């Protein structure tokens, strides 16, 4: 009778029940699952089968001993007591992995050293020779796990993790491990669908991991058939004849599977850079006759199997990690739902996602959800039957003349809150649109938290929409805030009739110091817009602000009207949009000062766009320092400082409330006789110092500097006209 060993199989969190079923099918007896593992009993043949055929395990460990550990010395003695001559040649190589802690062993490196020392000392005492350490490809890899004073000492039969099948030498930005992909396919019912001759399509296939794993299952190919080196290859307990028998059996099954008519398995990928790596992976896996990959956008996804058979749509859409990804992800899921409803009636779909709340935006009900972990990220597999009765849209599916189901043409139905938000946008558009068309305003604020539960600012930039989400108070449930954001983002394209890809979203929080200048993205896309006869460059993606403060539109137009023949000074000039207006208005010269080189470069482009350059001076400096040294005279000065600012180039921090008196005194000293200084800022609690009002002729003109799009929010800024008494 063959020896029976205790076997311990590790796996990613969430795969335990699937691995338990798989391991039992491969012969593991007395099996039971625990967190990220399955343990049971089996012969060496069972252990070999698990190594060769498990699609889900990370490692197959053969348990050598279990023992209590009181301290490092007792652990050393227990490991030393094992007869290591049965497992490792004294002149061979060894690697030790240690996990867990306790019993005075709180450092895994120290624990591994003690285990290694015990093995080396054992072999040296018996043979006079000692093994050397090879952490990459050892003859034997030993693992010791310590948990609550109990140690489990094992041999790693698998060697490198079993998810490394050997075919995926090229991968994309966010790949799924092969065993996780296999688990998702099993949960999605692919083995049954494949057995019935069904098809499989992945509309966002990346480098093809789902496709290869699906083909390996369908063709009855052992996932690790092509692996050449195993953890047991140089283990002294290895039985080569038994292994050869099992390996030849697996080769025969693979040959028989590949000899069958291939199933229809197709992948589509928008990124052309991933197409060849994916095809290379498929070729290495030996399933090139079964799997085909094409370049294609999600918008054109329409699987058409050769025999018209239905099957499984499987995909792992991207999930966002930076601010602003919400909109693109929302619309991606909406598009995925639309393609399923339009082109995949009668199919099953499995959407594996790290953002399951976005699954609700597909417009199709998920009848089953499975929890997984992709590393440390909690994920879900959303299972969907693509049938009209499952659609959550503005209409139910209809029937064609031949009785076949026809997908609804409408987008996913808005939630009740989303519809209310859409109605408000359309109401505002009717009111503000008339004003914007009459005054030829291309860029304006359409919505500014009009409904408190939808705390957004929605700005129109020509045929683009720029959305800023105001950060919710800590008292607001983040999940509810995100759900409302998704409601709003779903409503915007429908309400405004804009393409989804022309909606850009950011999160607005209080910006201080360097953060106000930090990039949010690096797309570098500039959009040209018009205002009052000038052309200006805005960037909707890369920075928190777009390069154009919409609330200052009336101030810029005022400057344009008053600038003729005057020397114009623009302090804290940002992208110098006011300077462009002054130059257009006929200013004799302009000087613009800002601490940000990025925005001064932007300012230079704005001026060049309008044909101005020679007389326009751009100064890279701290405004306060520059004012202390400048001796020029200016008939028109505009100051719109940030609330706070700091930089390595500054001494200290600029605070508009604290530093206003010095700032205005320095600037007024530069004001030419008969000149005017306009001062504005956006600090809602700002109060103009009484000493300023006592020394100069001060007139608050805030009301005159607000157009209809900001009339609902009179605290957006305050503005004053200041002259010498």
Curated annotation (Swiss-Prot):
NCBIfam families: PRK11783.1. It comes from Pseudomonas paraeruginosa (strain DSM 24068 / PA7) (Pseudomonas aeruginosa (strain PA7)). Residues 46-157 form the THUMP domain. The keyword Metal-binding does not apply. Signal peptide: none annotated. It is found in: Cytoplasm. Belongs to the methyltransferase superfamily. RlmKL family. This is Ribosomal RNA large subunit methyltransferase K/L.
């Amino acid at each position: 009778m063959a020896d029976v060993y205790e076997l311990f199989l590790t796996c990613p969190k969430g795969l335990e029940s699937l691995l338990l079923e798989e391991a039992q099918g491969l012969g593991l007896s007395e099996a039971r699952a625990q967190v990220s593992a399955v343990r049971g009993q089996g012969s060496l043949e069972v252990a070999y089968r698990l190594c060769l055929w498990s699609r889900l395990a990370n490692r197959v460990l053969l348990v050598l001993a279990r023992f209590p550990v009181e301290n490092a010395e007792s652990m050393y003695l227990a490991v030393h007591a094992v007869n290591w001559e049965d497992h490792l040649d004294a002149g061979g190589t060894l690697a030790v992995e240690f996990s867990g802690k306790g019993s005075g062993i709180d450092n895994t490196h120290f624990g591994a050293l003690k285990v290694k020392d015990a093995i080396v000392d054992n072999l040296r005492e018996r043979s006079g020779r000692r093994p050397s350490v090879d952490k990459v490809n050892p003859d034997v890899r030993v693992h010791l796990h310590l948990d609550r004073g109990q140690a489990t000492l094992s041999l790693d039969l698998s060697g490198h993790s079993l998810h490394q099948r050997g075919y995926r030498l090229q991968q994309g930005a966010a790949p799924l491990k092969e065993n996780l992909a296999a688990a998702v396919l099993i949960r999605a019912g692919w083995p049954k669908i494949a057995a019935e001759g069904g098809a499989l399509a992945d509309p966002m296939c990346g480098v093809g991991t789902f496709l290869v794993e699906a083909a390996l299952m369908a063709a009855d190919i052992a996932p690790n058939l092509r692996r050449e080196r195993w953890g047991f290859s140089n283990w002294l307990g290895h039985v080569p004849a038994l292994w050869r028998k099992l390996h030849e059996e697996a080769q025969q099954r693979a040959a028989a599977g590949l000899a069958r008519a291939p199933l229809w398995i197709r992948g589509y990928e928008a990124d052309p850079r991933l197409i060849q790596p994916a095809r290379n992976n498929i070729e290495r896996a030996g399933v090139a006759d079964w799997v085909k990959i094409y370049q294609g956008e999600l918008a054109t996804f329409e699987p058409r199997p050769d025999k018209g058979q239905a099957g499984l749509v499987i995909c792992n859409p991207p999930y966002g990690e930076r601010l602003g990804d919400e909109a693109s992800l929302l619309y991606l899921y909406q598009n995925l739902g639309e393609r399923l409803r339009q082109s995949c009636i009668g199919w099953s779909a499995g959407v594996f996602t790290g953002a399951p709340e976005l699954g609700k935006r597909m417009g199709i009900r998920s009848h089953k959800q499975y929890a997984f972990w992709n590393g440390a990220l909690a994920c879900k597999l959303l299972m969907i039957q693509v049938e009209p009765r499952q659609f959550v849209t503005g209409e139910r599916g209809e029937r064609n003349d031949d009785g076949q189901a026809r997908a609804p043409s409408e987008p996913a139905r808005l939630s009740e809150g989303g519809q209310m938000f859409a109605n408000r946008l359309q109401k505002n558009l009717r009111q503000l649109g008339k004003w914007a068309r009459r005054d030829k305003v291309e860029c304006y604020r359409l919505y500014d938290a009009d409904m408190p539960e939808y705390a957004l600012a929605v700005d129109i930039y020509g045929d683009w929409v720029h959305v800023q989400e105001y950060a919710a108070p800590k008292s607001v449930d983040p999940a509810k805030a995100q759900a409302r954001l998704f409601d709003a983002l779903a409503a915007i394209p429908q309400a405004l009739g804009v393409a989804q890809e022309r909606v850009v979203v950011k999160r607005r929080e209080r910006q201080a110091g360097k953060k106000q200048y930090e990039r949010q993205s690096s797309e570098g896309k500039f959009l040209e817009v018009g205002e009052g006869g000038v052309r200006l460059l805005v960037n909707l993606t890369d920075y928190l602000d777009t390069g154009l403060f919409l609330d200052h539109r009336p101030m810029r137009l005022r400057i344009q009207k008053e600038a003729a023949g005057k020397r114009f000074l623009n302090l804290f000039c940002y992208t110098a949009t006011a300077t462009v207006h002054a130059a257009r208005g006929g200013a004799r010269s302009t000087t613009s000062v800002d601490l940000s080189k990025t925005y001064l470069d932007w300012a230079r482009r704005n001026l060049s766009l309008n044909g101005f350059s020679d007389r326009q001076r751009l100064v890279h400096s701290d405004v306060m320092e520059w004012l202390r040294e400048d001796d020029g005279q200016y008939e028109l000065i505009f100051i719109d400082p940030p609330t706070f600012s700091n930089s390595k180039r500054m001494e200290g921090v600029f605070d508009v409330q604290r530093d206003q008196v010095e700032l205005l005194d320095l600037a007024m000293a530069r004001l030419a006789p008969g000149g005017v200084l306009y001062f504005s800022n956006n600090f809602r609690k700002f109060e103009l110092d009484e000493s300023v009002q006592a020394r100069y002729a001060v007139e608050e003109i805030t009301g005159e500097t607000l157009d209809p799009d900001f009339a609902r929010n009179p605290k957006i800024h305050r503005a004053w006209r200041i002259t010498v008494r």
